[in-house]
Amino acid sequence: MAKKVMKLVKLQIPAGKANPAPPVGPALGQAGVNIMGFCKEFNARTQDQAGLIIPVVITVFEDRSFTFITKTPPAAVLLKKAAGIESGSGEPNRKKVATVKRDKVREIAETKMPDLNAASVETAMLMVEGTARSMGIVIED
């Protein structure tokens, strides 16, 4: 018989840097999960993606065991890394903060494909370009 799901916890944690401090500790502590067990497993799984923020969905079962799925980093994080900026524009319609080549947008879209509900890389590119526009990043050919 399958285990009964008690709770789903969604977090965004820097790769390889999960620790029992907030936000990880309180979120998992409420569910009664072994926090150190999760932190060690997450850090081992994401150590090759250092510097990126990794979304994770943790499924907690009634017997307090858990499984988790790591997703691809958010498009905004990948765009900031590609453009070499710390944060997006506060006024994206007036103030542009960086430019990114279309090739780089394609690369980001291909990275994000498993998590996007896009039929092709071209539609995924449009989604990434929309994120870039809302951050004040200009896309050039």
Curated annotation (Swiss-Prot):
Highest taxon above the source species: Bacteria
GO molecular function, a single term: structural constituent of ribosome
Lipid metabolism is among the record's keywords: no
GO BP of this protein: translation
Keywords: Methylation, Ribonucleoprotein, Ribosomal protein, RNA-binding, rRNA-binding
Post-translational modification: One or more lysine residues are methylated.
Pfam families: Ribosomal_L11, Ribosomal_L11_N
GO cellular component: cytosolic large ribosomal subunit
InterPro entries reported for this sequence: Ribosomal_uL11 (IPR000911), Ribosomal_uL11_bac-typ (IPR006519), Ribosomal_uL11_C (IPR020783), Ribosomal_uL11_C_sf (IPR036769), Ribosomal_uL11_N (IPR020784), Ribosomal_uL11_N_sf (IPR036796)
Similarity comment: family membership: Belongs to the universal ribosomal protein uL11 family.
Subunit and partners: Part of the ribosomal stalk of the 50S ribosomal subunit. Interacts with L10 and the large rRNA to form the base of the stalk. L10 forms an elongated spine to which L12 dimers bind in a sequential fashion forming a multimeric L10(L12)X complex.
PANTHER family linked: 60S RIBOSOMAL PROTEIN L12 (PTHR11661), LARGE RIBOSOMAL SUBUNIT PROTEIN UL11M (PTHR11661:SF1)
Protein task: Forms part of the ribosomal stalk which helps the ribosome interact with GTP-bound translation factors.
HAMAP family from the UniProt entry: Ribosomal_uL11
Record protein name field: Large ribosomal subunit protein uL11
Species this chain originates from: Exiguobacterium sibiricum (strain DSM 17290 / CCUG 55495 / CIP 109462 / JCM 13490 / 255-15)
Lineage: Bacteria, Bacillati, Bacillota, Bacilli, Bacillales
Gene coding for it: rplK
